[in-house]
Structure formats: structure tokens, C-alpha cells
């Protein structure tokens, strides 16, 4: 159970989200599942009960109740097969898999137009989202749905080392009912029978090197709406360098350039040892369309015997002509806790493949376990 108090600050909400006002929200979610699996199959039914209660809602737009509740069940079924065969490719013994997977979800309709929306938004479509019942992030909106996601994956695994050196995945979601739940209070529901098509591939023929690519094909516009391609070098833990190019296309977004979702960006990030137990961290995210650096980050991590020190500075553009600079400094006392503001979330979101530096491994002497 989670209880949260929302208050409007100077910059807490804007636009329609600010019309939700102030108030309290209490959540309670419980679920039960029964996983079944064999050597080449799995079958997992799941039922979730979700209850949300709002009270003491003030300063909200007309039509939002001062007190309201929502309760509903969420049904899902996740199932798949794994087929395997052995082959020889490029002179190496390889195990190839073919993995079809289906995810079905059903959520009945509940009218939510009289409820506030503090933190829900439309989740970005990706492969993880295809296996999620609710298309909205946050807790204030739960979409009605009767949907089926179909995903097909193939992997090539080195028979000698067990390492995966190639994979490709394609997937799409199909809808069997119209959407009725909207994010806000004057947005009509949408009618469609399928989502965009997602495809992704990874290739790591050489040790430590990985090529990655992904596309999203719009079934509405009949063209590619999102592209991501990049290369990453990750020879060992806490050592990674990545370079990516990202392109988004949305002809329906007519907002001025800085605010719309059409992007052309290059993203460079790294985590790399400078000297023993000292690691450098950085990110440089540049927009070709706006001709500005939209996000940059620099930091250091140092680990001693029983403590770890992390520091970082992040600067990002939050609106046209305005930027925000964040400073992070955290001291982690191994086994006791942390002091200061942690940069781990910013580093994890900004640096591809980032892993927080852990404590030094304990050196075991020859007589440490002698009895």
C-alpha cells in the first residue's frame, strides 16, 4: 500500500496536469500468479487487483470529485515456446533458438474522468511495454483493454562459451476493443486494431564489441517513425563506451521545434577506469535539429576499502533558452548506508551499460577458512 500527498508547487505541474489540484492518493495492489514451465515452454496466468482512492482534492478543475475511488481486476497470460537447433556459422559451432511469445491482457472499463491525474502519461512503446497490461505509466490512469502482443525472437549462441553473439526480435500488439480511458478530461478515446511494429537486433562478433539497432514502423503513417543505431564497447565490468544515433518522426506534432517529439540526436557516453579504483563518467547528448547540447554529464567514482565516493555534475535543457544544472555528491559507507545526493539514477539513465562501482572484493588468505 502506498499513500502520497500531492501539492502544487511553482513548477510542479503545468497545463492539463496542473488542473488536478492538490490532494491525497492511496494505492493498494495485490496479485497472484501461477507459473508453469518445462524445458521448452512456459505458461503464466496472473490476476491483479488494483484499488486507488483520492480524497481532499482541492483547487482542481470543475468535474473532478473531491473524493473518489477506483477498483478493478487486471488479467494477463504470458506464454511462449523455445525451439533449439545446432548449426555451424562462420566456422563456429552455434546453437540457434526460435522463441515465439504471446502476452494477452484484459482490463475492464472504469470511468476515470472525475479523477485527478497527478503522474500518468502514455508509456513509450518498446518491447518491455508489449508485455505490460496498462499502456499508461504512473498510477492515475488504467486503460481498458483486450489485447494480444506477439513477439518472435531468434538468438545465436556460441556452443563453446555459451555467449550470445547475435539476436533479432520483432513484435506487435493487437487490440480487440476500442479505448475509452483517456489521460485527461477532454481527449477522446482512440480506435485502432494494432500498434506500430517494433524490430531490434544485436550483433557482437568480437569480444566486448556490440552493434545495436532498432526501428519502430508506424502503421498509421506507413513509414519508420523511430530509429536507433549504435556501437558499444564493454570489455569488462565498470568499463563501457557507447555511441548512438536516434531519430524520431511524428508528423502530428506541430509544436515549435524545441517542444515537439521529432528528434535527430547523437549520444556519446562512457564509464572508464582512470587509475586504480578511480573511474571517470560522462555523457554528451547533441541535437542536430536544435544545434545544441541537450544533456551533458561528467562525474567520478572512487572506491576505497570500506567506502565509495561518487560525484557528478549534470546540465540539461528543460525549455527553450533555459537549462538546469544538478550537482551530486554521495558517500557510501559499505554495509551501513549512504550520505548525500545520489547520482546513480542520473548515471544509469544517461550512460549506456553503467554499473555502480561496488566495494572492493575481499582478498582471502590461505588460512582464512582453516579449522
PLM feature spans:
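Outer-membrane beta-barrel proteins and related beta-barrel translocases across Gram-negative bacteria
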Residues: 1-371
